């Protein structure tokens, strides 16, 4: 089991009015999976293992946690204080939470593959994920490069 309470606290800080209806919305489940994956990439160890699935990174352990806490997840009913490290990640997540589900899919896939800073990231994603538009992938890569940086 991971630390879903930390993930939810970070999301609440990043976007206080965020709602994730994981019981009824596939897109909301996808968004939460991608948010947590990106938090991990930002250096926050939440204890979830991710595998590659059709729509990008997926953690069965995270799915178990959010289904077991569906009401807490939906309204972000959490009152936990963030540590300094968590607050830094939450600040960066403010831009991430504004991405659409398909943009999140593109960004998380690029991160999973290690392509964020590659010149041909757009072409690579287009080849493996042809259902994503060029605009979605470009926006995702742009946000990713701003938020996570390139080394």
Segments the model singles out, each with a brief description of its role:
Residues 1-151:
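Domain-edge interaction signal
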